[in-house]
């Protein structure tokens, strides 16, 4: 009989275990007991050792007699996988103590020794073959040994349908994975009626339909937003988006400034007023505006010289306002086809004219302060204009002057 001795730690106690292995066969060989089976024996006896140590600690504190359990007369019997265990506790005649060191200062030796005898079970060849066949069948069918009652009862029809559906899903995912890893030509995919092609094509159709519906919904939302913000009719927006290529080319050839000029000439009253035949008063006003434009030109030259002298090439506020007014005047060509936009354009032009008139007044004042000669010329032009207006109709001063001249001539005679 081969014996092995080792210790098992349980709390603050070290339990000494005497393991005896009974030989098997005619040769009395104990090689059948491997190290793996030793670990199995320790796992099976771990709970028994823990309960015995706890019982001893309780008895020692309460000073009660120990129970006669797991003795030589009534040993513990357990069965493992292919072996039989017989174990009991035996009191030691000599008290042993652990060597005091830094690691196990509180470790004590358990006063009872645990004796374990292991023997191999005498199974026949037929019994081992039957057990192996049953275990392989259960492993193939996925049946667990812990739930034998579930394995014996047949599944319900609903459970069968669910299992079949899960198997089909697994099979399709595997087939898709193989198709992705091994791409094939389009002719083979069309010619074969495999499940992977049948499942992939409807998904692509659904995806394209979803994308088409999303694009249509987005276009409708854009049309509604344009209608609510700009108050444009929906039909005109749709016509703009559905124009023919020839129309778009003809629209692209014309510059936005030309569209603006043609639209404003046909609708703006200012250009109609300028196209009429000028009268005497209109000619005087035209001369006055030309004089103002000349003054503006001289003011711009002065500003340019001042910028060059100061080294600042940035725009003065007047130039910035003019560029802002020109930016307001220029509009895209597509927006000129709507009367509402043209009305807004006319309002913007009127506002720009007012700003230009204010700038001209400021420039004329600046010219008076800087160029007194030009100011005298403008004053003389205003005096001639006033005399011309006085000559248009007889006034009381002229009559008094004529009567005064007649009186003087009569006195001389």
Swiss-Prot record:
It comes from the Eukaryota. It holds the Pfam family UPF0492. The modification Phosphothreonine is found at residue 389. InterPro entries: SLX4IP. Residues 238-254, 364-389 have a biased composition (Polar residues). Residues 172-193, 228-300, 363-413 are annotated as: Disordered. There is a cross-link at residues 61, 79, 167, 176, 236, 288, 344, 353, 396 (Glycyl lysine isopeptide (Lys-Gly) (interchain with G-Cter in SUMO2)). The keyword Disulfide bond does not apply. Keywords: Isopeptide bond, Phosphoprotein, Ubl conjugation. Interacts with SLX4/BTBD12; subunit of different structure-specific endonucleases. Belongs to the SLX4IP family. This is Protein SLX4IP. It comes from Mus musculus (Mouse).
């Amino acid at each position: 009989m081969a014996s092995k001795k080792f210790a098992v730690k349980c709390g603050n106690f070290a339990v000494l275990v005497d393991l005896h292995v009974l030989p098997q066969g005619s040769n009395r060989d104990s090689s059948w007991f491997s190290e793996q089976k030793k670990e199995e024996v320790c796992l099976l006896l771990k709970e028994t050792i823990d309960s015995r140590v706890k019982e001893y600690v309780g008895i020692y504190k309460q000073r009660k007699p120990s129970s006669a359990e797991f003795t030589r007369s009534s040993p513990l019997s357990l069965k493992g996988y292919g072996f039989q265990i017989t174990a009991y506790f035996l009191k030691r005649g000599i008290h042993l103590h652990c060597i005091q060191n830094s690691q196990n200062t509180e470790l004590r030796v358990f006063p009872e020794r645990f004796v374990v005898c292991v023997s191999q079970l005498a199974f026949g060849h037929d019994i081992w073959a039957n057990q192996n066949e049953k275990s392989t069948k259960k492993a193939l069918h996925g049946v667990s040994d812990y739930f034998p009652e579930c394995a014996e009862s047949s599944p319900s029809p609903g459970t069968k349908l669910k299992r079949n559906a899960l198997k089909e899903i697994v099979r399709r995912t595997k087939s898709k994975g193989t198709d992705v890893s091994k791409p094939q030509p389009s002719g083979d995919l069309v010619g074969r009626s495999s499940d992977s092609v049948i499942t992939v094509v409807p998904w692509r159709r659904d995806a394209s339909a979803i994308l088409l519906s999303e694009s249509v919904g987005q276009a409708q939302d854009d049309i509604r937003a344009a209608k609510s913000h700009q108050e444009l009719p929906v039909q005109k927006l749709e016509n703009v988006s559905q124009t023919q290529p020839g129309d778009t080319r003809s629209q692209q050839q014309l510059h936005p400034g030309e569209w603006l000029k043609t639209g404003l000439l046909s609708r703006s009253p200012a250009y109609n007023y300028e196209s009429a035949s000028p009268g005497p008063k209109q000619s005087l006003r035209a001369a006055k505006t030309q004089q103002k434009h000349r003054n503006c030109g001289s003011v711009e030259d002065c500003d340019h010289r001042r910028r060059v002298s100061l080294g600042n090439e940035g725009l003065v506020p007047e130039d910035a306002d003019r560029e802002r007014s020109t930016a307001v005047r220029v509009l895209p060509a597509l927006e000129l086809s709507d009367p509402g936009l043209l009305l807004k354009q006319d309002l913007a032009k009127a506002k720009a004219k007012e700003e230009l008139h204010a700038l001209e007044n400021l420039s004329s004042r600046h010219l008076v302060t800087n160029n007194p000669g030009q100011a005298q010329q403008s004053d003389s032009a205003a005096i001639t204009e006033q005399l011309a207006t006085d000559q248009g109709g007889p006034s009381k001063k002229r009559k008094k002057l004529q009567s005064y001249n007649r009186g003087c001539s009569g006195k001389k005679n």
